[in-house]
Curated annotation (Swiss-Prot):
Keywords: Amino-acid biosynthesis, Aromatic amino acid biosynthesis, Cobalt, Cytoplasm, Lyase, Metal-binding, NAD, Nucleotide-binding, Zinc. This is 3-dehydroquinate synthase. The gene is aroB. It comes from the Bacteria. Pathway: Metabolic intermediate biosynthesis; chorismate biosynthesis; chorismate from D-erythrose 4-phosphate and phosphoenolpyruvate: step 2/7. Gene3D superfamilies: 3.40.50.1970, Dehydroquinate synthase-like - alpha domain. It is found in: Cytoplasm. One of its GO terms (cellular component) is cytoplasm. Its cofactor is Co(2+); Zn(2+); NAD(+). It catalyses: 7-phospho-2-dehydro-3-deoxy-D-arabino-heptonate = 3-dehydroquinate + phosphate. It comes from Rhodopseudomonas palustris (strain TIE-1). Signal peptide: none annotated. InterPro entries: Dehydroquinate_synthase, DHQ_synth_AroB, DHQ_synth_fam, DHQS/DOIS_N, DHQS_C. Belongs to the sugar phosphate cyclases superfamily. Dehydroquinate synthase family.
Length: 381
């Protein structure tokens, strides 16, 4: 893979969806162009900024300023932090606030936050007046490389993650890499799991580049922009050919079947961030693949080593409070995975691996080998 170049101008990636195509704009301080871009996209539109309390303290004023500079009217909706806001109560709060702000069909909702805010604001926009357009301004690494791109929106159910939702594409994504400087190390690492996922599922050269350059990526600079842009290009290409996840878009769920079950088992709490669940889930998927003879054991070890090298959890016992609340229970994890969105006619579908950069969709996976695998992993704790 070529070394990243220093960019004096933002990088633009197109999500090619015909008349619903949109741009992902990546670079430092691209948020400064938000007002001008909205004015061109929707002349005369009013806006509502949906964000959480933490992001509001740092970025709401700046966002309001760039809208004020071009005379765009704006309201603000502030919700609590974390997965607990991706709920029926959170959805009601946002929808009622948007209605009270008189946001109409020709107006715009701005999702200013991480993956939770993007999912919640996008879902609310998709329902409001049967569909209002929205803009993603992702403020976490995970959101910039994954959840802000592709149009998946939704909330969680007590029975599982993202079980209630819609496909609703944004009209613009602004990925300001300067915002990532404000993330905690743990938040940044969690987002990095999704970056590594793109290499693991379909681009061995990118994975090797990450192994060699992750320190520079974590410190900022051109490597960070390069990683975000490469990740967005990979996702945009898959979304363009399979928007509704009827085919190979499911590959983007590498690590998510195990990971979502672990998130649900921990109550969608900060005991396990989404990216951390994905990291453990990818390692479990790789190890399960190796046990089935699909993937060299050395590749599974290589994946686990890289994720551990950057400080991500890679084992079930790395989860805080591992033995609490029934987490160390294979039957409970199997029950949670049975609610996975990829399940078809009650049969499990997993994203497994044939090697680094070669993920495959495995349909009709028998539950008994999965349960046995989990029981053995749990016994190692």
């Amino acid at each position: 893979m070529n070394a990243p170049q220093k960019h004096s101008a933002p990088i633009t990636v197109e999500v090619a969806l015909g008349d619903r195509a949109y741009e992902i704009v990546i670079g430092r301080d691209v948020i400064a162009s938000l007002g001008e871009r909205i004015a061109k996209l929707r002349p005369g539109a009013r806006t509502a900024i949906v964000t959480d309390r933490t992001v509001a303290k740092t970025w709401l004023k700046r966002t309001e300023e760039v809208l004020d500079q071009v005379g765009i009217a704006h309201a603000s909706v502030i919700v609590g932090e974390g997965e607990s806001s991706k709920s029926y109560a959170g959805l009601e709060q946002v929808c009622e606030a948007l209605i009270a702000a008189k946001i109409e069909r020709n107006d715009l909702v701005i999702a200013l936050g991480g993956g939770v805010i993007g999912d919640l604001a996008g879902f609310s926009a998709s329902l409001l007046r049967r569909g209002v357009d929205f803009v993603q301004v992702p403020t976490s690494l995970l959101a910039q490389v994954d959840s802000s791109v592709g149009g998946k929106t939704g909330i969680n159910s007590p029975q599982g993650k993202n079980l209630i939702g819609t496909f609703h594409q944004p009209v613009l994504v602004l990925a300001d890499t300067a915002i990532l400087d404000t993330l905690s190390p743990r938040q940044f690492r969690a987002g990095y799991a999704e970056v590594a996922k793109y290499g693991a599922l379909g681009d061995e050269a990118f994975f090797a580049w990450l192994e060699a350059n992750h320190a520079e990526l974590f410190s900022g600079g051109a490597a960070r922009e390069h990683a975000v842009a490469t990740s967005c290009r990979a996702k945009a290409a898959i979304v363009a050919r399979d928007e509704r996840e009827t085919g190979d878009r499911a590959l983007l769920n590498l690590g998510h079947t195990f990971g979502h079950a672990l998130e649900a088992a921990t109550g969608f709490s900060d005991r396990l961030f989404h990216g951390e669940g994905v990291a453990i889930g990818m390692v479990l998927a790789a190890e399960f693949s190796a046990e089935r003879g699909m993937m060299p054991a050395a590749d599974a070890q290589r994946l686990a080593k890289h994720l551990a090298d950057v400080g991500l959890p890679t084992r079930l016992q790395d989860i805080a409070g591992f033995t609490q609340e029934g987490l160390a229970d294979a039957d409970r994890l199997m029950a949670l995975m049975s609610q996975d969105k990829k399940v078809k006619r009650g049969e499990l579908t997993f994203i497994l691996m044939e090697g680094i950069g070669r993920a495959v969709i495995a349909n009709k996976v028998e539950p008994a080998p999965v349960r046995d695998f989990l029981q053995r992993k749990l016994a190692q704790a």
